[in-house]
Amino acid sequence: MKDFAKYAFNKSHAACYAVVAYQTAYLKVHFPVQYMAWLISSVTDKTSKVAEYILAAREMGISILPVDVNKSVAEFGVEGKNIRFGFNAVKSMGRPTITAIIEERTNNGDFHSMQDFITRMAGVINKRTVEHLILAGAFDTFGNTRRGMMNVYERMIDSAVKQNKDAISGQMSLFDFVSEEDKQSLEMKVPDIQEFEKEDLLEREKEVLGVYVTGHPLDEYTGMW
């Protein structure tokens, strides 16, 4: 620290920087996943920095997991030895919407399908939010293709909004007379269609996240040079 304090600044200023440098180095060595998650979260408004730090994390052997409606939190989070993308990184996701999603999940359990998510969050989300979550991979956990979900999400939202309006006006619907288990069987189905071509899928992903997460367009050329 004494040697560091001799460099350019007055001693008190340089000593403070030295302390921060040593603390940061300690955290990076002993708590690498937590440190990188915090570091990436600190620059979510700077896409180029997010990409830079994600690359650095991967070079450290840390996997970056995509957004997940049942696992993501607002910031980049620690999940075992991996880092999970946070909702803050998704284009058009505001803090009130993120808070509402996490609270709904905490109070009433995980979402079991995209339609379940849309139905439970109909008063908070809009079509753009759902579109961006689809393209970010947030619903991949349900086993549907992103292309299939893009094909049907608008109709799901329109249906959920109508149900909400009917509930407010006191009108009854078929869903009022069936059990929770039966409601799941009556859900609008996501069509089982082929996924987007890899390059198209990744470009759409990058459009809403600012970075590639589940792959890279040049992956197939790895090892050719």
Where are these regions (language model features)?
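Noncatalytic, beta-rich nucleic-acid-contacting surfaces in large DNA/RNA-processing enzymes
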Residues: 1-225
